[in-house]
Amino acid sequence: MRLSYISLTIAIIFVMAIVHAPETEAKAYPEADAVAEAIAVGEADAVGVADPGFKSMLAKAALKILKAVAPAAAAAIADKIG
């Protein structure tokens, strides 16, 4: 068998394995779902709020980069922002 047919052969074997694989059905356990939901609700309160100054810090960094790349465009944007 030539080297160019190896990838085609592997692809055909892979497809045949998927087509002829035994079908399985997932079983849902309501107790596990209830516990997972309770854990998720309990942990949701522990998540902190993002720093409100993050957007302004990101905008300042983007403006610095823009000043280095295109000073005229940066000046126009800085005038619009204020």
Curated annotation (Swiss-Prot):
Primary location class:
secreted
State which residues form the propeptide.
Answer: 27-52
In the record, which residues are listed under signal peptide?
A: 1-26
MF terms in GO: toxin activity
Pfam families noted in UniProt: Pilosulin
Note the superkingdom of the native organism: Eukaryota
Instruction: List localization entries.
Output: Secreted
Which biological process, per GO, is one annotated for this protein? venom-mediated paralysis in another organism
Modification Isoleucine amide occurs at: I81
Gene Ontology terms, cellular component aspect?
extracellular region
Q: Which UniProt key words apply to this protein?
A: Amidation, Antimicrobial, Secreted, Signal, Toxin
Query: In which tissues has expression of this protein been reported?
Result: Expressed by the venom gland.
Keyword Secreted listed: yes
UniProt record similarity statement: Belongs to the formicidae venom precursor-01 superfamily.
Q: What does this protein do?
A: Induces paralysis after injection into blowflies (L.caesar). In most cases is not lethal 24 hours after injection, but paralysis is irreversible. May have antimicrobial properties, like most ant linear peptides.
UniProt-recorded name of the protein:
U10-myrmicitoxin-Mri1a
